């Protein structure tokens, strides 16, 4: 009996010997991550890392909103600004897999009216152009207005030329376009007969057990919505305002085009799970999200021969190719910012690494195009999960 106790004690000591360094390593990483959030004046934030198909690290910092002082947690929904485009892009790729959409079809076919740059009437505008930001749209047009009607702005019969660059042939020039991303949402509604948020929930989010929405009112736990703050820490959007934002759960492509620009609300772990899908073969937790061919297409550069796009765009299907985040490695993903929001989702396929950075307000300084806070957090992930430097 004494011998058995002695053996059990030795086993327990051995287990503790392994566990203690691991715990110490995680505490050290927590401290490093917290320091980045602190130095960036973040009100609240989240950093999630996944590798080899599983979430391996997550850290939540600060508060959801200053009035309630509720801490940020894995249950917090963040508004993810332009990362909305990448998530919408995954939904669009799924529709392409299913044969509902063709990336090279004239979008007029889907919208039910003729969309043309009046200076290039023989050149159709395609979904591929919209998703690579090469459609030649004017970004400072009336699309930003809450009452603008989409068809009034792009239907050639309504003399909508002011919303196009009249000296730029569609497909020939890269120019980042929020408006173009909005049009893709209108296409989803026109084709499916459903509002874009409900369609994405039904076809993409629900099968994965993800609670996310383009309308705050559709979320299961709206009490967990993070406020949005300006760079200086002042309030920009309260959760109560987001819940009151006008949104009708029926197809209204002439109006709902605004939501796919940047209104998605999602929890950090769920965004990381979508990242796992596009980092690998299109599956997550055994569920097929998109085909492996679709994942490959999101990473491939366009060419004139295969796609009819002559522009040198860093985006393919709302996915940017980025070569400066990790040393000697290419990552794919998207960045989002709106006032003080920072949201980044990047995947690095060689090491099967996914990183998610989300804040509800912080310093939005950039280094070589990428948010400084994201570069600093990515450096920690690179150090630990790629280089294996654990202190």
Q: What are the functions of these language-model segments?
A:
Residues 1-11:
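Bacterial N-terminal signal peptides that target proteins for export
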Residues 11-19:
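Bacterial N-terminal signal peptides
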Residues 20-25:
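Sec-dependent signal peptide cleavage junction
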Residues 26-78, 100, 158-164:
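Short, conserved catalytic-motif segment at the N-terminal edge
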Residues 38-46, 68-129, 166-179, 259-262, ...:
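Short active-site loop at a secondary-structure junction
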Residues 65, 119-337:
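Short, surface-exposed loop or secondary-structure junction motifs
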Residues 342-361:
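Short, well-ordered beta-strand elements
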Residues 361-391:
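Short, gly/Ser/Thr-rich active-site loops of penicillin-recognizing serine hydrolases
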């Amino acid at each position: 009996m004494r011998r058995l106790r002695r053996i059990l004690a030795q086993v327990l000591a051995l287990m503790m010997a392994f566990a203690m360094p691991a715990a110490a390593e995680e505490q050290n990483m927590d401290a490093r991550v917290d320091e980045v959030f602190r130095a960036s004046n973040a009100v609240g934030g989240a950093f999630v890392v996944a590798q080899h198909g599983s979430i391996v690290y997550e850290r939540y910092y600060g508060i959801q909103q200053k009035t309630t002082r509720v801490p940020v947690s894995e249950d917090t929904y963040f508004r993810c600004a332009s990362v909305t485009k990448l998530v919408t892009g995954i939904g669009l790729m799924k529709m392409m897999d299913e044969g509902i959409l063709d990336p090279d079809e004239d979008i007029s076919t889907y919208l039910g009216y003729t969309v043309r740059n009046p200076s290039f009437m023989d050149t159709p505008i395609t979904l591929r152009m919209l998703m690579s930001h090469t459609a030649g749209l004017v970004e400072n047009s009336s699309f930003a207005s809450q009452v603008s009607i989409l068809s009034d702005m792009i239907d050639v019969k309504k003399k909508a030329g002011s919303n196009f660059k009249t000296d730029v042939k569609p497909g020939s020039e890269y120019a980042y376009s929020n408006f173009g991303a909005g049009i893709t949402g209108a296409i989803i509604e026109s084709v499916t007969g459903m509002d874009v948020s409900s369609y994405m929930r039904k076809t993409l989010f629900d099968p994965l057990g993800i609670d996310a929405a383009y309308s705050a009112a559709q979320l299961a736990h709206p009490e967990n919505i993070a406020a949005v703050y300006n760079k200086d820490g002042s309030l920009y959007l309260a959760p109560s305002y987001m819940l009151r934002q006008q949104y009708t759960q029926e197809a209204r492509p002439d109006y709902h085009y605004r939501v796919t620009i940047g209104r998605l609300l999602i929890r950090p772990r769920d965004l990381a799970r979508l990242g796992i899908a596009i980092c690998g073969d299109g599956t997550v937790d055994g569920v097929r999200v998109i085909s492996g061919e679709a994942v490959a297409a999101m990473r491939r550069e366009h060419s004139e021969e295969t796609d009819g796009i002559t522009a040198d765009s860093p985006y393919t299907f709302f996915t940017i190719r980025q070569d400066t985040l990790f040393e000697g490695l290419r990552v794919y993903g998207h960045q989002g910012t709106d006032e003080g929001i920072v949201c980044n989702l990047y995947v690095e396929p060689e090491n099967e690494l996914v990183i998610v950075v989300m804040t509800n307000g912080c310093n939005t300084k950039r280094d070589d195009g990428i948010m400084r806070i994201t570069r600093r957090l990515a450096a920690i992930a690179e150090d630990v999960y790629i280089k294996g430097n654990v202190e």
